[in-house]
């Protein structure tokens, strides 16, 4: 089978049933998994993106946009739920791909997941730092800008962002059970703040603010009208990302075959309801046009300012001015759970790849006392902490989206494959309406990826090239499925993939430069060309050596 060898289902089942001091401790139940999902899905995006999208694209129909986005996300969620009940091991999409598409594809998706979780944790850590600065300024404490911003933003190092990564990593190293309890508390807190906003704001809803529910299109595609609702759905779609991290905790779940689908789909359902109700109240207490030009949590602040009574001059005096500070506090705590769950996800993917021999065994060692992959946790504490301290948030944020959507696409495709290749394997949960649901999931994710900026595609391609280098130099030789094979089949495909990615890096580089203008910053274009030429040479030399060895 060579590089497309598939991990036997029996081996996956044996891995799922492992027990003892050298395995992950099973402590999570269905509610813990739902809390993990809700914890990583709900971030500050709910408070900032809702008003912005309503003001620019949808009007009060933002609730429809959330519903459409949830349906699109549910396609991938249903596919994840089937695999999580069928193959309940750590590794998420990496493990599912290994069982259905083979080792090379599994490596690509595993490397992509590492990117997804790394940049997600980085992005949220940077945002956490910003909200901390705002919160402390409100109580008279000022952190010097140089110590709370990256170099490209006039600072030196973002210390708060790095510190929160270190703190959450220590939580994870000391045990999943304690981390789960902490996460549960945080989820309760931020859901409580959302519900308080909804309950307090309900009596201030003005029905006239919902008329028209879908404002007339301005004449530009995507600005109000039904096209605006669809554009809004594409934007708020990213507010649902993160539920896939639940599947990485399969080997720490007491009854994964039963509870994993509950955790994945339950968290999606709860978040959808919260998002829609929150958006309904927010656009009801204030007219959607009032949110225009607002950034951060300012749109919510506008709604809170309308939750009051007007005096004789018509000026509204808010009844709950403290709610703004409560929301900032909820965001700070809520971000902690997002960071923790993404750090958990990436360490579990690394653990699975290491156990399969594709990465050094150092990363699959389990801490004897805490029964957690401490080495992987420490590695990502250093990497994510460093990135959070020095990297711009926009770059990391867009990389999160494309990495997640790529993983969703392959998992949906894997369901189509596994239904044909493993029809008799027991599934505690089955994706309904196959092949319709997986196909719709693939199309939805690909459409979302196409709307992302060209520079995001460049970074994805460059990351994939680096990953292919690691696999070619280490993984191919140390894979446990074919560790005794001296010359593995499929090396030509591997080398051609490297050349194809090199060409793609040039294409995306030129695409980006054309988008921003040929006179603008050409740094990314230069990097893509350097990567392309060096990797083309590297993989062509590998092909030449392979051909020479065959002739001997």
What name fits each language-model region?
Residues 47, 112-130, 235, 240, ...:
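Membrane-helix boundary/coupling elements in multi-pass transport proteins
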Residues 129-138, 188-217, 279-286, 413-425, ...:
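Hydrophobic alpha-helical segments and their helix-loop junctions in multi-pass secondary transporters
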Residues 95-96, 102, 133-145, 216-219, ...:
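TM-loop-TM module centered on a large, flexible mid-protein loop between adjacent transmembrane helices
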Residues 28-47, 160-171, 201, 219-285, ...:
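Hydrophobic, membrane-embedded alpha-helices of multi-pass small-molecule transporters
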Residues 153-156, 363-372, 408-459, 466-502:
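C-terminal membrane-solvent junction of multi-pass transporters and transport-like membrane proteins
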Residues 3, 25, 48-152, 270, ...:
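Extracellular loop-to-transmembrane helix junctions
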Residues 1-49, 55-60, 67, 74-78, ...:
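Membrane-interface "cap" regions at the ends of multi-pass membrane proteins
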Residues 129, 156-207, 264-268, 400-410, ...:
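Membrane-interface loop-to-helix entry segments
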